[in-house]
Every structure is written in C-alpha cells, then in structure tokens.
Amino acid sequence: CFNNRENGLTKVLGVNASPNTIDELLSAEVILCAGFVAKENQVIRLKLKQAAANGAKVILVNPEGYEQDHMSFAYKTISTSNSLAFFKGVAKVLVDMGKGAGVEGYDAFKASVENADVCEEIKAVAELYANAKKAMIVFQQNVVSVEAATLLADIAVLSGHIGKARDGILELKAKNNSQGIIDLGITAGAEAMEGVKALLVFGEDVPADALKELVFLMVCDTHMTETAKMADVVIPGTGFASTYGTYTNTERRLQVVEQAIEEDVVFNNWEVAAELAHVYEIEMPYDDIEDISDEMNEKLPVYRYGEMGEVSGGVLECKDAKLVAVEDAALIAPLKCTDHLTNMIDERLPKAN
C-alpha cells in the first residue's frame, strides 16, 4: 500500500496500532498534539474541543508556518522548528525528573537526549504533561516522521502515561480502513516496489516514477486515473459506496459497511483478485464476503473475538515497551495520499475558513 509508512510506535511499544481510543480524550487532563492538522481531522478536532470544555489542557505543537488554525480552544499553541528539538527537550526534562529509570533501553536513551536544549516553555510543557493524572498524546501517522512517532512513544513510556484508560497515545491512521490493512499483515509501503516488474493496482493513483520499471501494469479502479491511462489492462472497480463488509478504523473499532449503490460491473473488487488467482491455478474458495470473513475469524484472533461496533482488544497495555533512541529528523514529513477517490472527494469538499 503506497499510503503505508513504518510505524514508530512498533519500535517502542511493540504494537502497530493506536493503543488508546478516541473518547478517552474526553476524560484526560492534558492532551499533547504533535503535527495535528485540524482541517483533515474534524472529528478529532471536535473531540479535542469537547475535552477542553471538560477541563483538559490541550497543547498543540506544530512547526513554524504549519497550521495552527481552528484550535482556539487550545490551552497553548507552540510553533517550533521542523525538527525533533522540542520533543527531545521534553524527553530530557522527563529524564531529569527521574522518570523511566527502570525501562529497558533507558541508559542509551538518556545519553541520546543529554545535550538537548531545554527552555522554560519546554520545561513547563514537560512538567504539565508528566504531573497530570491522565494524559494523552495525539498525532497523525502519515504526517509526523517515523522518528517523531518513535520519540513521542518514548515520551509516553518515560512519563508512565501509557497502557491505561485515558492515559496513552491516540495515533490517527491515514484512512478509514488503514488499521484493517495492517491487521491483515499488509505493512509494506512504496519500498516494496523495488524489483517489481508486474503490478495490479486497486484504487490508487501511483506516482509515475514508481511505475517506470514495470513490464506489465493492470489497474482496477472506478475512474480513468493517470495510472489507469498507463495501464496495459484496465478493469472497472467498485467504490466504497458499492461494497459491503467491515472497516477497522483508527481506534481499532469494527464498523459495518452497507452497500448503498449498485454498480454495473462484472466483478466486485475481491472477485477480481479471486479470478486472477484462478488463472494461476490458486483456488480461493469464496462464494461471498461472508466466506472471507469466516477465514479472517479463523486465522486472526483479533477478529475472531471482535464484535461489530466494538474496539478490538480494548486499551493495549504495551507490556513489552522499551525506550528507543532516535537520530535527529524532521517533526513533520507528510506522506502524500495516493488514494484516487479520497483525493477527488477532498478536492470537492468546501474548505473551512
């Protein structure tokens, strides 16, 4: 998936998912937001606004020139350089407070932030966050860099604000079913294209440079995208409104999708893959979506015991958490969305003032 990015949380917490859930924000005392773009996350912005109304101190940290709009309810908005300097300073303050001394990797991490600069503002934020009874960190996975996500997880582990209700991290995934893709074991991003000579693309408008080494390209999509124009074969696909099944959203909640539109296509998207497998004498014994769901339930415990509308796994305890030192890097490194329908809808939606 071209919209996949390595998850910095995995290095520290051992999980490739958001440990906490959205409504936990409403009962937190302090919420630290890093690289948060309000206009791209209106639902979360409203939750943050509700949390502030409930008494939470919402702190927004974005690089200079980056969006600070639509967050007037925030307790503090901070403009910093597009680097990890601010959060390395926060980590140093936590270390100096004696936090996290018993955690695996502590000595190497302590050495990595020993020379971090600490100003009064950094010290105040670190102490406010560390001393809260319940504190959350919020960030967008495909907006902050991998190193930034790793450092934010380090900060949560150092402070002890991890693995408990209303005490942890809310990692916002790029799309409505990004977590579902990860649960199926699909974690590779554009780096998986190295050496690939033939490609089947579902719904993504891929940068042309990523396709130049291909000898065969097949596209299944709802529109004649730029990628489809380059393809050797194009098959009409079905959009989200013409499918049914489930999504697993950013907080690991299972959500039912009901078909709203009947599209005049020969194959549904999953049937395209099944028919291609049949050509290569690989049988996929599915008659319908229910058969696929049954196999997922059999092979994936997280879905076997999942209930529709519920969060799979509850709050993740992250018992194997450790500290991981990070090199200097950007705080913000947005990954461009290649989902054609998502981009088309985003272009046509009215923009907030």
Enumerate the predicted regions with their spans.
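Non-catalytic alpha/beta scaffold blocks inside enzyme catalytic domains
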Residues: 2-307, 353
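Long, low-complexity segments enriched in small/aliphatic residues
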Residues: 148-153, 292-353
